[in-house]
Amino acid sequence: MRLVLLGPPGSGKGTQATRLKDTFDIPHISTGDLLRAEVAAGSPLGLKAKEVMARGDLVSDDILLGMLEARLGQADVAKGFILDGYPRNVAQANALDELLGKIGQPLDAVVQLDVASELLVERIAGRAKAEGREDDNPESVRKRLQVYTDSTAPVIGFYEQRGKLARVDGVGSLDEVLERISKALGR
């Protein structure tokens, strides 16, 4: 099973990716985690990324794709993976499709977790309070949701046109959402 998990901030992508990893016994690949690991390891890509981030800029698609290509070349992804945090725009979706085609591992499915904006704001505000994260205030959350709508939401259409997209209601208990995802994947 080769799967991309999409959804706005606070939709439960990371939580469900971890649960799916255990359910399907395939690795959960988070581009954020990959980036942090490469920087910590001091790899050539990590050093480039560190320099970019130190300037306050976004890490380029080329750097992210290079990290992803290296990760997808590892043995544990032979039977599949769950990708979270990538692609974030249509250019990245095209690059991912090209990369996966090159290595003979095309995506099986893309799951979009749907959650209403106001509930997302509530969820993230609750998480911020529990974790003491000051950057998760309602205004910054709304801005992040707008960035998602502007950049990442078009990726939904990209995969919908290719017949890969499954939309799943992301509201409910963790088990209910996992069950909906599994059902959407035909499992």
Swiss-Prot record:
Q: Where in the cell is it found?
A: Cytoplasm
**Known PROSITE patterns for this protein?**
ADENYLATE_KINASE
- Give the highest taxon in the source lineage: Bacteria
Keyword Transmembrane helix on entry: no
Segments of this protein annotated with the region LID: 126-136
InterPro entries registered for this protein in UniProt: Adenylat/UMP-CMP_kin, Adenylat_kinase_CS, P-loop_NTPase
Known EC number? 2.7.4.3
Keywords carried by this UniProt record: ATP-binding, Cytoplasm, Kinase, Nucleotide biosynthesis, Nucleotide-binding, Transferase
One GO molecular function term of this record is:
adenylate kinase activity
Instruction: Specify whether Nucleotide-binding is a keyword of the entry.
Output: yes
Catalytic activity of the protein: AMP + ATP = 2 ADP
Which residues are AMP-binding?
31, 36, 57-59, 85-88, 92, 133, 144
Question: Which pathway is this protein engaged in?
Answer: Purine metabolism; AMP biosynthesis via salvage pathway; AMP from ADP: step 1/1
Binding positions (ATP): 10-15, 127, 172
Instruction: Return one Gene Ontology term, BP aspect.
Output: AMP salvage
A Gene Ontology cellular-component term: cytoplasm
- Give the enzyme class: transferase
**Where is the stretch described as NMP?**
30-59
Subunit comment for this entry?
Monomer.
Q: What is known of its domains?
A: Consists of three domains, a large central CORE domain and two small peripheral domains, NMPbind and LID, which undergo movements during catalysis. The LID domain closes over the site of phosphoryl transfer upon ATP binding. Assembling and dissambling the active center during each catalytic cycle provides an effective means to prevent ATP hydrolysis.
- Family named by the database record: Belongs to the adenylate kinase family.
Question: What does the record give as the function of this protein?
Answer: Catalyzes the reversible transfer of the terminal phosphate group between ATP and AMP. Plays an important role in cellular energy homeostasis and in adenine nucleotide metabolism.
The protein's name: Adenylate kinase
Q: Which gene encodes it?
A: adk
